From Swiss-Prot:
Protein name in the entry: Phospho-N-acetylmuramoyl-pentapeptide-transferase
Pfam name, any one: Glycos_transf_4
CDD domains: GT_MraY
Provenance organism: Pectobacterium carotovorum subsp. carotovorum (strain PC1)
Pathway the protein acts in: Cell wall biogenesis; peptidoglycan biosynthesis
Amino acid sequence: MLVWLAEHLAKLYTGFNVFSYLTFRAIVSLLTALVISLWMGPHMIAWLQRLQIGQVVRNEGPESHFSKRGTPTMGGVMILVAIIVSVLMWANLSNPYVWCVLLVLAGYGAVGFVDDYRKVVRKDTKGLIARWKYFWQSVIALVVAFSMYAIGKDTPATQLVVPFFKDVMPQLGLLYVALAYFVIVGTSNAVNLTDGLDGLAIMPTVFVAAGFALVAWATGNMNFAGYLHIPYIRHASELVIVCTAIVGAGLGFLWFNTYPAQVFMGDVGSLALGGALGTIAVLLRQEFLLVIMGGVFVVETLSVILQVGSFKLRGQRIFRMAPIHHHYELKGWPEPRVIVRFWIISLMLVLIGLATLKVR
């Protein structure tokens, strides 16, 4: 919005051209989302407490979690508001990639909101029925996937980028839609599974978003894309603004979500953030990079799949409890230790992922 306004004001005073610079807009996008999130936090927490919208804790979970019962949840609303407002202010709104991410953020946020509402307001422990949750996730993902395919059909925007092989970039055709669908839905649910401890999901989300901000900048720059042997995608650079908004909103939320948490993001936050990261990865043609940088989300998801599969096939559990962060809690690790170690691993994986862009 401000980009469009600045273009017209620059005719009167050239100083307004600063609003067209990507680096400037990336910084102020981060700061805007951070300030909005920090400002909304106390008001959101107080409002949720008045409405008695508190976390539901399972009796079969770790005993240390019983003290979390009643902690305000659905705080992901403030994350989404901060991101969306910041992006609408600082991004070029004529860019279709920006709208693809915003659609997933809003759509998955709505699905998560209904799920949380049923759990904490209607006291329905199951929340939104699983098949309906998956149905709406699928509808939104397919709408966005087909839209992205229509935008980038038969261009580098629909090629598959394989790590370590600079000359292996097959054109996917309609398989692009299927891949986009699985990445968006899968990442959304992976972040949701990870969101089980104070600050555990939000910091890896911030790290991955920061990593993708760098990738988006390189992908949208013809010279750097050529240097790194990744596809040059014309619309990609504007995703930097989206990524930095996620970073800012995430850091602002962490202020209140760090141990011991004053508020939880709930499904409204985790489903939306995961879906956004998946969408960004698809738009940048970096699905494999997402697997590396988002390795914490991948391991959390695999631990659940392995646990359920092992119990159904052998009648035995691999872990004391899944997702795997609960396994370490039950081994006696204090919650802050689990959280910080997962953060460190996440940061390492993001750096390794970025390094793979050069190892080709």
